[in-house]
Amino acid sequence: MSDTGALQSQPVRPASGKPVFANILCAVDGTRKSFAAVEQAGILAGPEGHLTLLAVTAVTGSGAYRTAAISPARVEQVLERATQIAERLEVPSDAVVDPGAPAARVILERAREHDLLALGAPAASWLGSKLADGVTAAALKELAVPMLACRRLPPGEHSFAERILLASDCLEGSDELVGLTRRLAAAHGSSVILLHATDVESSTRPPRISEQVDALGDALKDAADVRIELDSPAEAIVQAADETDASLIVMGSRRHKGLRAIGSVSRRVVREAHCSVLLVAPAET
């Protein structure tokens, strides 16, 4: 099937009431994962939200040496397909073509004017979308707004955001991540699994975990939905997502701390997880 083939048929649960993310930028390049980003962003925004469908052609050179990442004819097809997805979900949208380059810089600058950036997730190998790879790498260094790296779920699995894996490092700022997840769960009727993974052995449970369990309330269906794992955080998150059939991972990206180890956790999870990943940077202090 071509990259513009039909998206899988999934139950769609639009946001109820005021969406958590109302103004979403979707970067589309014609790949199936970028169209999945439009669909998942539309589910988050709902009819009361708005999608900006952005195709960056990254035009360089002039005359015989003029090149573009996406041809004019291809851009029209890509945006028409993306608009059809938004219309099916009854989500208002605008289509925008930006000839600027490099594409990653253009997308990240435009994302600052939105609540969320949605795009196709990068491939686990080098055989992937250059757009997704470039934007993800840049965003992990300077994430200004939350970023949703999207993957299409296999048929028969939970629909998008139906089952959320929340990865909490229990550090300062993680309570805000819990609050965001609680709002998402309330808007979409989601169940939540709370995961704390650390490679440092301890005989005590992090005090903040108990507080976060209370904050999540009935989004946690039972005690088994709270997991404490002694393992590499990236490996634990990817494995827990597989074991629990999560359809969305929510986690932080601590680029403000300048810790390469933390950044690598985000990068590995975005590349290796089977489902979409919502990355949120801690607030500026």
Language model segments and positions:
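Structural beta-alpha unit
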Residues: M1-P19, A73, Q84-L117, A124, ...
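Extended, non-globular alpha-helical segments
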Residues: S2-S16, V135-P155
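Small/aliphatic-rich secondary-structure junction motif
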Residues: P11-A69, V91-D94, F160-R208, V213-R227, ...
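Acidic (E/D-rich), amphipathic helical modules within compact regulatory domains
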Residues: A36, L44, H50-L51, R66-T67, ...
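Active-site phosphate/pyrophosphate- and oxyanion-stabilizing loops and adjacent acidic/basic residues
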Residues: E39, T83, R105, A137, ...
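A short acidic, glycine-rich active-site loop
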Residues: A69-Q77
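Short beta-strand elements of ligand-binding domains
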Residues: A118-A121, P146-L153, G252, V277-A281
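Glycine-rich, Arg-bearing micro-motifs that act as flexible, cationic patches
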Residues: L119-K141, A161, L248-E272, P282-T285
